[in-house]
Amino acid sequence: MDIQHDLVIAHKYKIIQCIGSGTFGNVYKGVNVKTQDNIAIKMEDKRTSYKLLKRETSIMKYLYEHHCRNIPAVHWFGPVNDYMGLVIPFYECSLIQYRKIKSITLSKLNAIMTQCVSILESIHNNMVIHRDIKPQNFMVKQGELFLIDF
């Protein structure tokens, strides 16, 4: 996937660097040029994954609007040249990365698992099932967990 760095999306979101890649596309760290807030931009090929990314966006918006615990806000979703883009808040690291950089005590592990269960309970109460639960899909920001990749 060839996305130019410094590309500005929707006159607001600037791509800084690629921070991950997956089956259908890449995730970039970016910045909101108006507020200077860091954001994450998921870019996927329009031809192969439009429906999947649109579905993911719809689920995240639905859960966020229903006050589900720790679901990212969708800042923007739409076409970017031959790609579809999804802009959400930027998170420090995934739970798996967090485990590698932080020493996790038993009490901290208990708190993390309690947060995970609480997030899952919240989405299940809204009739949504996440089909890819794994540490890489729990993101950390200021010690709080967020579930991504619906």
What are these regions (language model features)?
Residues 1-15:
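A short, low-complexity linker immediately N-terminal to eukaryotic Hanks-type protein kinase catalytic domains
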Residues 26:
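Conserved N-lobe ATP-binding subsite of Hanks-type protein kinase domains
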Residues 33-54:
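ATP-binding glycine-rich loop module of kinase domains
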Residues 59-69:
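Structural motif at the C-terminus of the N-lobe alphaC helix and the adjacent alphaC-beta4 loop
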Residues 73-84:
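Short beta-strand micro-motifs within the conserved protein kinase catalytic domain, predominantly
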Residues 91-100:
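Structural motif in protein kinase domains
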Residues 112-113:
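Activation segment signature within eukaryotic-like protein kinase domains
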Residues 124-140:
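Catalytic-loop of the protein kinase fold
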